[in-house]
């Protein structure tokens, strides 16, 4: 009898663990915990934030500082095979923009990533990215337009860029003016959680 109860408990726990959805965050330094302990980064805080919204989600942070869309595209197949996520959040493009990469190249890389993710059976959420205005209005506008146009064309969800809110609080930004401090990470985690629960 005890053995039977143990087996029942084992299978119940196994089913519960399998019920947790898996989210892969594919990003750059904005998601990689730049110049801070990784446990303070918003992806590390995200599971608890999602749990507050009633969503049990395992978060895999596949972000690497300095990554471009090309780097993300190159790494994506292995990440999909290794983690088999249910949902992938793409937070890439800032480094492409800072280096002045052609919008056509960025669009192509993002589009290929979306196709790979869809082919794996996972859903996609893409984050809007914006480059600083000192890159010129023409390029900044062309860069910004990549994301809504691609989201509409590929029929994927587009998440607002969290940095547009964070940057309004100077005390939350590092001296480089590009990266959020550890103090901003809990707010970012809650912001992302509120957006993601719409798609989980």
Swiss-Prot record:
Record's keyword terms, sorted: Hydrolase, Signal
Entry EC number(s): 3.1.1.2
Top EC class for this record: hydrolase
One function term, GO molecular function aspect: arylesterase activity
The keyword Oxidoreductase appears for this protein: no
Domain of life from the UniProt record: Bacteria
Active site: 29, 176, 179
Catalysis performed (reactions): a phenyl acetate + H2O = a phenol + acetate + H(+)
Annotated signal peptide: 1-19
InterPro entries: Ester_Hydrolysis_Enzymes, Lipase_GDSL_AS, SGNH_hydro, SGNH_hydro_sf
GO terms (BP aspect): lipid metabolic process
Main function: Favors the hydrolysis of several arylesters.
Oligomeric and partner information: Homodimer.
Family membership noted in the UniProt record: Belongs to the 'GDSL' lipolytic enzyme family.
The protein's name: Arylesterase
The species this protein was found in: Vibrio mimicus
């Amino acid at each position: 009898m005890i053995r039977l109860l143990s087996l029942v408990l084992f299978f119940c726990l196994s089913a519960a663990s399998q019920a947790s959805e898996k989210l892969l965050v594919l990003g750059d330094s904005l998601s990689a915990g730049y110049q801070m302990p990784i446990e303070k980064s918003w992806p590390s805080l995200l599971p608890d934030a999602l749990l507050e919204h009633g969503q049990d989600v395992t978060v895999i942070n596949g972000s690497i500082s300095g990554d471009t869309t090309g780097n993300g595209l190159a790494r994506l197949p292995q990440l999909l095979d290794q983690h088999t996520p249910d949902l992938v959040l793409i937070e890439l493009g800032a480094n492409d923009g800072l280096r002045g990469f052609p919008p056509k190249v960025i669009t192509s890389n993002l589009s290929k990533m979306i196709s790979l993710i869809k082919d794996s059976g996972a859903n996609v959420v893409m984050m809007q990215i914006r480059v600083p205005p000192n890159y010129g209005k023409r390029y900044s506008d062309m860069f910004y337009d990549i994301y809504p146009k691609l989201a509409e064309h590929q029929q994927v969800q587009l998440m607002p860029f969290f940095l547009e809110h964070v940057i309004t609080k100077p005390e939350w930004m590092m001296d480089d003016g590009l990266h959020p401090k550890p103090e901003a990470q809990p707010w970012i985690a809650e912001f992302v959680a509120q957006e993601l629960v719409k798609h989980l």
